[in-house]
Amino acid sequence: MVKDVISSMNVHMDKSIESLRKEYQKVRTGRASTSLLDDIKVDSYGTLSPLNQVATLAIPEARTITISPWDSKMIAPIEKAIMNSNLGLNPANDGKMIRLTLPPLTEERRKDIVKQLKRDAEDAKVALRNIRRDAIDQLKKLEKDKSISEDEQKRAEKEVQDFTNSHVAKVDEVLLHKEKEVMEV
């Protein structure tokens, strides 16, 4: 029973960290990344489709993303979707493909991005603490129901805290890595 509580908690904590990593992939650094365009939906013959389902995305240079639609009629809707995305990117269309050139980030913008990264990391830590609280509540309930002894409960709580500390350290590590990436000129 204790192992079930701890393994369930561990799975939830891992998912929280993975969610933070995915969120960080969408953050614009000075470098081009196709994950910037993950949330863009294109009007494809009356249906909203993810951009990567109607075109091939490539990164030929460090600050350039090329979008090659599978159907040339899709260039205008793709361009429109990018303009409406609030990413601050200006698509350049040559009739066959769309080029997105990412402007270099200003120092001020980099600092704003880092502040947002820190807020996201703090939110992830709050989620981890909530998961820890739920696990400890489950352990206390098991002890109250006499399913486990008080000693087992205390040992399990210490294990829960150790897992929480290691996951918080992982969040800090992910934040530090992304912060370096953003501040790199």
Swiss-Prot record:
Top-rank taxon: Bacteria
Pfam families cross-referenced by the UniProt entry: RRF
GO terms under cellular component: cytosol
Disulfide bonds: none
GO terms under biological process: cytoplasmic translational termination
Location of this chain's protein in the cell: Cytoplasm
Molecular function, one GO term: ribosomal large subunit binding
Keywords from the named record: Cytoplasm, Protein biosynthesis
Keyword Protein biosynthesis assigned: yes
Function (record text): Responsible for the release of ribosomes from messenger RNA at the termination of protein biosynthesis. May increase the efficiency of translation by recycling ribosomes from one round of translation to another.
Family to which the UniProt record says this protein belongs: Belongs to the RRF family.
Annotated protein name in UniProt: Ribosome-recycling factor
Source organism: Citrifermentans bemidjiense (strain ATCC BAA-1014 / DSM 16622 / JCM 12645 / Bem) (Geobacter bemidjiensis)
